[in-house]
Amino acid sequence: MYFVIRRSSNNQYYFVIKSENHEIVATSETYIYKASAELTIDSIKREINYNSDVIDTTV
């Protein structure tokens, strides 16, 4: 499982959780600040798998 941070059409941030075979498992709500999305990802990683990769497509 890994996370991909993206930007929505209204310039807010969201992330998708993808499985090892690259299928989307879940999509988050949108966040005004990228830091908010990152904090949510960290929270999920603590509960599931802290070694999950995060790919930031917004940079």
Question: PLM features: what roles do these ranges have?
Answer:
Residues I44-V54:
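Short arginine-rich
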Residues A26-Y31, S52-T58:
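Short, tandemly repeated low-complexity microdomains enriched for cysteine and small residues
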